[in-house]
Structure formats: C-alpha cells, structure tokens
C-alpha cells in the first residue's frame, strides 16, 4: 500500500503551519492516519541542521553550503520519516519540501536549477509530492506577518528583492505543473483559506483511501 504525500509551500507569513494542522485535523476526523512533519527538520538530526540553517550568525553562510545542508536534512528526513510513513499507507503532510529549495536557493539565492535538480534526483530518486498546496500572498503582507510573530530567522531577515524572487519561483513552478499544484490566496481571511482547503477534502479522502 502506498500513502499520499502532500506538501505545503509558500513564502514567509503565508500561514502554512496553521493550515497544515487544519488539514491534518480534517483528515484524521475521517479516520485517516496522518503524519505531520516539516522541512528543514522532521527528525532529531534534521532539526539540528535546521537550527544551523535558520540561526543568524556572524559568519555568512555560503549559498552552496546552505543548499547542501538543506538536502542533507532532507535525506535523513526521507529515510526516517517520510518513506516509512508512505510505505505503510499514511498521508504525509509536510510543511515545505523541495519546491522551497527551488524557490529559496534557486530563486532567492540564484543558484543553478540544474544543480538543484541533480541533488533532488540523488536524494529523492523518483519520489515527488502527490499534491502541493501553494499559499500565495504579496511579499510585503507576508513579511509584516512574520515580523509580528517576533524574532526573525536568517531567511526572514532577507530583503524585498529576495522574497520577490522566491514568490516568482513558486508561482512559476505552480504554473508549469498545474496537475500537482493547488494555488490558494493566503492574503484572504483564514476562514476563507480553510474553506478552499475543505473543497479539496473529497478528492483527498478518495485518494487516501485508494
């Protein structure tokens, strides 16, 4: 039995974590086994890598170092959490996955997309999400929400141009593969966003039950 792999993507302040929890609750209420996780992170080792990636520091991190750390955490996450859960037929809901790598390291940092694709194949093989929800909103709105949460991490401290490139990368990927991506307007009130998620539930339940 093969499970269902759902990823949630979008820029800072888009409400991914809140809506990840909401979607998981709705699926669990229907008797579906759900594994909630996040990237970078998801295992004790990968969470330590996350701390290195997100913590501001005196030494500037080289973009290639950043990219390799992201995929190192992902390799551990896949081996310990994602692949075993999918193998037993669970629904895996992950807050960020490889689309964020293309958006942040590819779009924001300007790294080679071909290099990212090579690492993607090396680490993931042919594993790709079955469905990706992209929570889109204007950059300035997302950054204001992130600032309101309190202390900013290393990525949240980046400027407008960085996040403009990140948003463009997400939208470009969603437009190129509409059968996998579902775009949501995250600038709406939360209740409206969750109504859009509810509209997906019948399809998700059908796929989760095989």
Curated annotation (Swiss-Prot):
SUPFAM superfamilies: P-loop containing nucleoside triphosphate hydrolases (SSF52540). PROSITE patterns: THYMIDYLATE_KINASE. The keyword Magnesium does not apply. GO terms for cellular component: cytosol. Its EC number is 2.7.4.9. One of its GO terms (molecular function) is dTMP kinase activity. It catalyses: dTMP + ATP = dTDP + ADP. Pfam families: Thymidylate_kin. One of its GO terms (biological process) is dTTP biosynthetic process. It is an enzyme of class 2 (transferase). It comes from the Bacteria. Keywords: ATP-binding, Kinase, Nucleotide biosynthesis, Nucleotide-binding, Transferase. Gene3D superfamilies: P-loop containing nucleotide triphosphate hydrolases (3.40.50.300). The keyword Glycoprotein does not apply. Phosphorylation of dTMP to form dTDP in both de novo and salvage pathways of dTTP synthesis. PANTHER family: THYMIDYLATE KINASE, UMP-CMP KINASE 2, MITOCHONDRIAL. This is Thymidylate kinase.
């Amino acid at each position: 039995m093969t499970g269902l792999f759902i990823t949630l993507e979008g820029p800072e302040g888009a409400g991914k974590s809140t809506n990840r929890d909401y979607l998981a609750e709705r699926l669990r209420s229907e008797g579906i086994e759900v594994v909630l996780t996040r990237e970078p992170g998801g295992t004790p080792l990968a969470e330590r890598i996350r701390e290195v990636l997100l913590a501001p520091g005196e030494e500037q991190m080289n973009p290639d170092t950043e990219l390799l750390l992201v995929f190192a955490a992902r390799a551990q996450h896949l081996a310990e959490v994602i692949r075993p859960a999918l193998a037993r037929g669970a629904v895996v809901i992950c807050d960020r996955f490889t689309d964020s790598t293309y958006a942040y390291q590819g779009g924001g940092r300007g790294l080679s997309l071909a290099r990212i694709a090579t690492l993607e194949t090396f680490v993931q093989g042919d594993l790709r999400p079955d469905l990706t929800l992209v929570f889109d909103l204007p950059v300035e709105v997302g950054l204001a929400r992130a600032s309101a949460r309190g202390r900013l991490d290393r990525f949240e401290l980046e400027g407008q141009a960085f996040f403009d490139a990140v948003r463009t990368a997400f939208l470009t990927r969603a437009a190129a593969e509409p059968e996998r991506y579902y775009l949501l307007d995250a600038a709406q009130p939360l209740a409206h966003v969750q109504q859009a998620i509810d509209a997906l539930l019948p399809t998700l339940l059908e796929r989760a039950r095989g």
